[in-house]
Amino acid sequence: NRTSPGVPLKTTSYVEDKEYTMNSVDEVYTQVLKDLDLADTCLVNTTIKNHPYRADITAVYLLKSRIYLYMQNWEKALEYAQKVMTKNKSLLDLNTLTTETGDVLTKSSPETIFSMGGHLLASSLIMKYGENRWGDWEALPSYTISDDLVAAFDEGENDLRTQYYIFKTTLGDDYYAPYADGWLFRKVRGWEYGYKEVSDNFLFRTAEAYLNAAEAAAYTGDEGTARNLLKELRDYRMID
């Protein structure tokens, strides 16, 4: 319902001593698209950047695609996802990785469009109670991956995401918790290698454009385009 309460909108940078009220969902979407249209105008003629820490027009297109998908405006979502892929449709081939290679998500990945930096999501998902170290807490994470999500990876060892996105390990210890097997996050293995250049938190990747376009195409009745996009993405995620 576009008239339902959304979030309060604050469009000024200065502090105001006032209570804010929630704007409607429609007002929030209108403001987000207004900001993205301005970003589009400002960035459309800029040169291609050589690092991921500043947004360019490709990042604008991807975020527009995401917003239009949320709004169920399938035609616009597909249009902007295709604009992303016109600029960059490269994908990381998981078939080229090994478990010793390191992180799936890196600054130099062909998929990387924009990153806000190396926030370690692993410190809240892996370490005990969000501790800022690995050490003694390696088997006592705050969160594990749900059984429902693990079950969604239903192609077994052929699905390389089960090797590089998540991993199974024994959790618990003799004092804090009983031992049990569980699945943990591993796209960015900050606990193993220290500071990371990117995180999947606020990371824009070309893979999202494929998924946005496929979903939007399916909803517009273009099943052929949706299947082709998913197949192309799967080719980079499944064993050859």
Language-model features and meaning:
Residues 1-45, 49, 234-236:
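Aromatic-anchored glycine-rich loop motif in surface-exposed flexible loops
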Residues 6-10, 14, 29, 54, ...:
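Hydrophobic-face positions in mid-chain alpha helices that act as interaction patches
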